[in-house]
A protein has these predicted regions:
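Positively charged n-region of N-terminal signal peptides that target proteins for export
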Residues: 1-6
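Non-catalytic propeptide/linker segments at domain boundaries
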Residues: 74, 93-115, 119
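Conserved active-site-adjacent core of cysteine acyl-enzyme catalytic domains
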Residues: 20-83, 89-91, 97, 101, ...
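Active-site nucleophile-adjacent alpha helix/oxyanion-hole segment immediately C-terminal to the catalytic cysteine
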Residues: 25, 120-168
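Bacterial N-terminal signal peptides
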Residues: 7-16
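Generic structural marker for isolated residues within well-ordered, non-membrane alpha-helices
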Residues: 10, 141, 200-203
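Short hydrophobic alpha-helical membrane-anchoring segments
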Residues: 15-19, 147
Length: 303
């Protein structure tokens, strides 16, 4: 009810000020923003948020993803600069969003853990001297290891630094390297990937070698299982297919760290720390529709 009222007020104010009736896509963006605010997912520190641009995106086919249906993408801003983004389908279904500075939340509709370092992918030198990405799989794994290494009982799982952790896990996996034909990195480096089962094996072997008492397990996506892990203070690695925020016409298979869950308007979302996403405020959570999640990698201390 509040969401509908706020959107209606947005239209009314525009008319009273003598403005043309707002475009439907801007009204839809305001409606989504109101719903997120009601769910406690809009940081008060952002102040007044403005929908500065809305565009219709035609998704592009890639080597991994078929061409999807067009969708809408909105850029948000506040007095301090960028405030986040929203993405939704033609039928109004919210599929992807982020609000700057939201790094933890506890409300009746949402919950998210803080403390997972937002390690970003970085270029490495290939044997032929060219640049290749560190890869989302070991980079996400390193963020999770860094989280646990900052906690009693698992502190010995750390390393000399964040990139050292990435390299260490990467060295335990068979990484596939492919040229960046689609422009994910604007051709700056080749892409690198690995499978979730190899990540699980690498994490278990790395923990065992350092005397870290944890169990690592694979699971298909399960909302209740994910919620239980997060409520117990355990972030979860997830495999997903997501939009590329800096180029939303592109999608790809991705590995990230799940830190949150939310229900907005009857739909369910997973909050993640993304390793190929650079918001204005580092550590801001990105939220994706749960139907984009395929697999979970669980890490559980034994005591």
């Amino acid at each position: 009810m509040r969401t509908t009222l706020r959107a209606s007020l947005f239209v009314l104010v525009a008319l009273l000020l003598g403005c043309a009736e707002p475009k439907p896509e801007f009204v839809q963006a305001e409606t989504h923003l109101s719903a997120l605010r009601s769910a406690g997912l809009v940081p008060k520190a952002l102040g007044d948020i403005e929908v500065t641009a809305v565009r219709r995106i035609q998704s592009l086919p890639t080597r991994w993803v078929r061409q999807g249906r067009p969708f809408w993408w909105a850029e948000l801003s506040c007095d301090d600069g960028a405030a986040g983004h929203l993405a939704w389908t033609d039928d109004g279904r919210l599929i992807d969003f982020s609000l700057e500075g939201l790094s933890a939340v506890i409300t009746p509709q949402a919950f998210a853990l803080a403390g997972v370092p937002p390690i970003q992918q970085f270029p490495l030198k290939a044997p032929d001297g060219s640049a290749v990405a560190s890869g989302c799989v070991p980079t996400a794994g390193a963020s999770l290891v860094a989280f646990w290494s900052a906690r009693p009982g698992t502190a010995s799982w750390g390393g000399a630094g964040e990139q050292d952790l990435v390299r260490r896990l990467r060295g335990r996996m068979r990484m596939g390297v492919l040229p960046d034909l689609e422009g994910y990195t604007d051709g700056k480096m080749s892409l690198a990937g690995a499978f979730p089962d190899e990540l699980a094996e690498a994490l278990q072997a790395d923990a065992d070698e350092r005397g870290v008492d944890v169990d690592v397990a694979l699971s298909g996506y399960d909302r209740r299982l994910l919620g239980a892990e997060l409520s117990a203070g355990r972030p979860v690695l997830v495999s997903c297919v997501v939009l590329l925020p800096r180029k939303p016409e592109l999608s790809w298979g991705h590995q990230v760290v799940a830190v949150g869950r939310a229900e907005v308007g009857g739909a369910h979302y997973v909050g993640v720390i993304d390793n190929f996403f650079t918001p204005r405020i580092p550590g801001s959570i990105r939220w994706i529709a749960e139907d984009r999640i395929a697999q979970l990698v669980l890490v559980r201390p034994r005591r």
